[in-house]
């Protein structure tokens, strides 16, 4: 979308705001309570299981050199926010955590962008299954610090900067892969590779950093195609069903959480990913139950959006900032209900529990 389109939207803001109302909400101060001497780093993920336990994925246990340090920590809290345990301490797959999800059986899944791996834990915290392979420390040719232009061709079973997971009613797992391969992989409930779909690009079915993924009750997949500033909806075989774009006006003086105000026209002219553009989806989450809705977020102007599964914006909330009820790059959303969501923030090193009115 061209910058002039954003200008036009701003010009008709009063009418457009009426079509996409602002949602009133509250945020509980410090909903997760860490023990003395333990600290969060960047919060990259948050998930909630059937008992109401909250799982936070933090880049808080940094080890190694300042550059390319390992930083992944998976922490569990009970429904009151009391710390229970750390899961997978010193796990081989830990490098640079990306997202955490809970499947219908309360198994815990973590994607790690740095190690190119996906790990499935049991509810007790035991490793059940691993996907992908971490590069060998001595492997300079394909190691994590090397950037190939063009990137290496995708391989069956190998991920490159993997981002997220989702499941369909048949128990198949879908893995968004990711910053490099720009595709979605499908594996069955036994872990067998079935197929992949998507490739780098901006056309229908092509992807530019599939950053987050969620599935509805029918097994349709909602992929946060962040670099293309859209959500693409696929069926379980990878056929494109529709495209969702978020074009909600925002104040002209809206401040970014970090860096300069994004210039969409310049980004497009340079062929850059639209990661920081208004409406570019960083996270997607679909509520359970018979009447499902979709929540997503952008980095600028820093909002959460509530949508129907067909793509209608039902409302929005929040803005960029460092105070309670403001957001600093929401990286993942957990939505156990339509009225309660959890957001994990990179820049503010925190999780917020939001109650929508």
Tell what function each PLM region has.
Residues 1-7:
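Bacterial N-terminal signal peptides that target proteins for export
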Residues 7-16:
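Bacterial N-terminal signal peptides
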Residues 19-357:
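Eukaryotic scaffold repeat domains enriched in small/polar residues
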């Amino acid at each position: 979308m061209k910058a002039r389109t954003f200008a036009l939207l701003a010009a008709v803001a009063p009418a457009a705001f009426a079509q996409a109302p602002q949602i009133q909400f509250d945020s509980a101060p410090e909903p997760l309570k860490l023990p003395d001497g333990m600290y969060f780093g960047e919060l990259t993920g948050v998930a909630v299981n059937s008992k109401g336990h909250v799982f936070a994925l933090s880049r808080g246990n940094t080890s190694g050199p300042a550059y390319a340090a390992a930083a992944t920590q998976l922490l569990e809290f009970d429904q009151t926010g009391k710390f229970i345990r750390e899961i997978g301490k010193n796990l081989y797959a830990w490098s640079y955590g990306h997202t955490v999800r809970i499947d219908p059986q309360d198994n815990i899944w973590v994607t790690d962008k740095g190690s190119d791996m996906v790990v499935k834990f049991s509810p007790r915290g035991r490793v059940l299954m691993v996907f992908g392979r971490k590069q060998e420390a001595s492997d300079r040719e394909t190691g994590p610090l090397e950037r190939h232009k063009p990137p290496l061709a995708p391989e069956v079973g190998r991920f490159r900067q993997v981002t997220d997971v989702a499941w369909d009613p048949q128990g198949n797992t879908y893995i968004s892969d990711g910053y490099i391969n720009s595709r979605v992989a499908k594996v069955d409930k036994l872990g067998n590779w079935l197929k992949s779909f998507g490739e780098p690009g901006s056309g229908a079915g092509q992807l530019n950093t599939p950053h987050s993924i969620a599935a509805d009750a029918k097994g349709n997949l909602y992929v946060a195609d962040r670099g293309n500033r859209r959500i693409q909806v696929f069926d379980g075989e990878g056929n494109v069903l529709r495209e969702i774009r978020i074009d909600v006006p925002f104040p002209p003086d809206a401040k970014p959480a970090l860096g300069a105000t994004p210039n969409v026209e310049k980004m497009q002219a340079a062929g850059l990913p639209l990661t920081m553009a208004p409406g570019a989806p960083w996270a997607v989450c679909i509520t359970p139950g018979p009447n499902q809705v979709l929540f997503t977020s952008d980095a600028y102007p820093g909002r959460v959006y509530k949508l129907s599964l067909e793509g209608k914006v039902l409302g929005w909330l929040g803005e960029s900032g460092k105070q309670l009820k403001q957001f600093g790059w929401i990286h993942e959303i957990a939505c156990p209900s339509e009225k309660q969501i959890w957001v994990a923030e990179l820049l503010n090193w925190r999780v917020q529990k939001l109650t929508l009115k």
